[in-house]
Every structure is written in C-alpha cells, then in structure tokens.
Amino acid sequence: MRYLFVALAVLLASTLVSAQAPAPVSGPLTRHYRDGETLTYRMTATNEDWHYTADVSGTAKKTVNGSTVEEFRWTGMTSNGQPIKLTPAMAQFRENLSLDPNWTPSAPDMGKTDPKMSGPILDFMTFYVDLWLVNKVGILQHAGDHFYVPNPQTSSWADGNQVIVGKDQIDFDLNLQSIDPVKQTAVVVVHHVPPSHPNLQLPAEWMQAPVADTANNWVEVKKSDDGKFEAGVGKETFDVTIIVSTADGRILSASMDNPVVTSSRTCDDAALTKCGVPQPHTIHRHIEIALVH
C-alpha cells in the first residue's frame, strides 16, 4: 500500500511562514484552549482499494514556553471492516499537535509507531497543520479571504530501502470560504497545488514530460523484490476542507481528497534507462475526520 506523506510538505511550509509571519491576530478561527480538555476523533479513509477507520484522542496541556499542545494517542483501527491489533509501541506513542500559532509544528517520530498507522498519523497531522498555518498567517478574517503560500522546498518519504526516491512539491492556497454566525461555524479550504516551476530533481530524462496539465510535482522509485525498479512520476494535488467552531476554534470535521495522476514504468536498472512501456494510473485517497466528543 502506497503512503503519500503530504503532511511533510505542510511542515516545510509552516517553517517558512513561522519565519516570516507577523504576530497572529485573533479572529473567527482562533483556538481557545482549556487546560485538560480532551477531544476524540474518528477517521474514515479510502486509499484505492483499502478502507480503514482509526480513533484518536487528545488532551490539551500547557508547554514550558506557554503555548498549548494537544497530546494525541491512537486507540483503535479497523482495516476493510476488521479490527486490527496495534503493536505495543502504539500504547506509548503520542502525537503532539496544536492550533496555537505560538507553537511550532514538528514531525512525529515514526520509528516508534506501528507501520499500519503511518497514513492515519500523518493525515491527521495534515488537518491540524493546515489550520495551524491559517491561524499563523492570521489574515483570514472574513468570508472570501485567501492567502497564497509558495513553497520552494520539496518533501521526501524515501526510506532508503524499499522507497529509493519519494518526493513531491506543493504550494498552498488558503481560503476562508464561509462563516455561519448562527451555527457558529466556519469553512476553511486549503488547496495544495503544484508550483508553476517545481524544483524536483527527477532521476530520469523520460520523467520530464508532463503527465497531466502542469509540470510534474511528484516522483517515486521503489525497489521490488525481484531486483527491478518501479518508477513513477506525475501530478499530485489535494484539497482539504475543515469545519471549524467559531466559538472556540476546534476542528468539528474535515475531509481531504488526494489524487495523484501518474505514469509508471518497470525498469531493469537503477538509472531508469532500461524500462518497459509507460503505464498510466491515478492514485486516489479520501480521508475524513469527525469530532466524536
């Protein structure tokens, strides 16, 4: 099963914004934390032919520098309708996330997690860091406001073993789509789009040709068990929609659509020069979270 670690790109963008953004302004999306507050979410996801659910609960607590963080623990998972027993390491694993603009996001230690949970952990982080990014920028105050964040950096999910190369590059279009004063909710939409001129270092000449209607911004090379190389290139986008409580800034629900339009070849050599015919393919993931209590 192929994981697309889009959350890592969001972290890179958050680093850039942290260095450039002015002090955040309180607005309709501001998170008002209560120390000890606990939130529980249910994630429902489809990754091509794989369907899964996962449950996560987090408790708010103050950090030593005065910001607030939510310490999340993953409590359960089902795969294609069947309960999955998580590894003992997951009982100790904590995922620290926050919507406090004074906090700086960081990647979790994935070496201490159950491999089956990589997708849920990183996708959940994407929802949080996307909204954190909106709060950090601090200028989305009214329905229709938007802000574009160019991202010159690439993110990588290569592990050096099976995944030899795994990179993407995306820009961010932040939008405050609507505010409902009666329901006390706001709709935030974050479009993750290819840069006009990605600076990906593509490992083969045949990867330069655009697969879709933009320059390629996604590349992956995996080594198969028979010693061959599965190489693909293409266009990745994803759209995140977040329903936010304007009363306290909590995420009430969210969804993410993540299509990748690719062209892949099976190659005999690591230089990717002795390859078979191109095979078009579209990878599609859809993830939703909902606040349970």
Named regions from a protein language model:
Residues M1-L4:
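Positively charged n-region of N-terminal signal peptides that target proteins for export
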Residues V6-T15:
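Bacterial N-terminal signal peptides
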